[in-house]
Amino acid sequence: MNRKLYQGHFAKKRFGQNFLTDEFVIDQIISSIHPSPEQTLIEIGPGLGALTLPLADQMDKILVIELDRHLADRLNQHPQLKDKLILYQQDVMTVNFSELSATFKQPLRILGNLPYNISTPLLFHLFKDIHRIDDMHFMLQREVVNRLLAAPNTKAYGRLSVMVQYHCKVIPILEVPPDAFTPIPKVYSAMIRLLPYRSLSHPYPVTDIERLNLVTRQAFNQRRKTLHNSLGALFTDQELAETGICPKLRAENVSVEQYCLLANRLH
């Protein structure tokens, strides 16, 4: 049997397709999501429906975004889904999640088993509509999850760490071995929950998110340089020091809170 053939579908490398097949892992994920029938839940990249089908059993409706036309057609024709499935056959990077939230008149819950090549750009895309999202559950490569959870002064800590931790509380749920998927990937995966902060309870309020984007981009684009050099076009050494940051530090030595303080100093 061809290792990339599963349930009559050839996994497409360009879409990063690895299908979740372990029933125990699937049950754990569904339990952690804990869906309610009336909620608006969106699954990104449902594939062959490993999560879609058990979720549909508990939902009045389920929205899915699937780029692969063959998989989209299979889901549309599935008898268990025909009365509940709302399918968007398109690139998730073109989806306006605020518009979807307005259409269904409530905040969104989002989940997905994300391929490595889209995980970072997709997270930044979702941040644009974060105010319309209740929570997110994602299966990611363990390396990416380590970056989301990383603390300052570590190798894994980078711009992604700062921006995710600014927007959300990051909660690891479970690690998933390669043999839980078909075809079997070469890496471990992990499931995480992202809980967006609300403005009134945000630990690091920023007046303009574009300023935080600018500061972190400048710092981490030249992460081996000192802040004196990487942020010299934005701040004087005195301004850095007044924020409690030594100009001789590098990007990975600065906490999320300190980046937010710097963003709020920009005019």
From Swiss-Prot:
UniProt xrefs under NCBIfam families: ksgA (TIGR00755)
Encoding gene per record: rsmA
Transmembrane parts of this sequence: none
UniProt-recorded name of the protein: Ribosomal RNA small subunit methyltransferase A
Location in the cell: Cytoplasm
Cellular component, GO annotation: cytosol
HAMAP family named among the record's database cross-references: 16SrRNA_methyltr_A (MF_00607)
One Pfam assignment: RrnaAD
Species this chain originates from: Hamiltonella defensa subsp. Acyrthosiphon pisum (strain 5AT)
